[in-house]
Amino acid sequence: MKKVIKIIGIVILCIVALLAILLVCISKMSELKKDYNKKIETGGDIEAKYLCDGAHEVSYYEEAAAQAFEKYEIYYPKELETEDKVYPVIVVCNGTGWKASKSKSIYEHYASWRFIVIATEETHSWNAFGAEMCIVHLQRLNNNKVINDKDNIFYQKIDFDNVGIIGHSQGGVGVI
């Protein structure tokens, strides 16, 4: 009987170890592929148009963030650096275990259509606290001409009258 219990224990331990390895591998998996939007088939002209990248070159900015957010990742149209305009915003709520850095290509896609996109590395955005902190961070960027002793390219260029929020999986709950 002891031998059977020992064997069952070893089998359970092996299963748990394999599941742990599988979860680690999944969390390290590559994200959305760069050309994801070219592989989607659609029957509509409007969908086809907006599946393609927009006309604007995209730039990237990041800044360290507190707690589990790790960093604020901001994708924006490069013209923002030289133009005196305001730009609409998309705030991202990540799904469970999914960091913003795994979805770069979709954020670059949105920015190519002239949106500022902000996300974090938070992996549990069910309560939208990360989204709230993104808005606070954008307000800081919008209201300060100089940040960390450098000219701030986002100064007075964020359109807070046109802010959208997106999320997938658990991040969808944060959107609500």
Segments (PLM) and residue ranges:
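Short amphipathic alpha-helix adjacent to the substrate-entry channel of hydrolases
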Residues: S101-T120
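Hydrophobic alpha-helical membrane-insertion segments, chiefly the h-region
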Residues: V16-K28
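N-terminal cap/lid segment of alpha/beta-hydrolase-fold proteins
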Residues: M29-K85
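N-terminal Sec-pathway targeting helices
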Residues: M1-A17
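Solvent-exposed loop/turn segments at secondary-structure junctions
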Residues: L80, G95-K99, V117, E122-N127, ...
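Gly/Ser-rich "nucleophile elbow"/oxyanion-hole loop immediately N-terminal to the catalytic nucleophile
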Residues: E81-K85, F129-V173
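Extracytoplasmic/secreted proteins, especially bacterial periplasmic and envelope-associated proteins
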Residues: E73, P88, S105, S112, ...
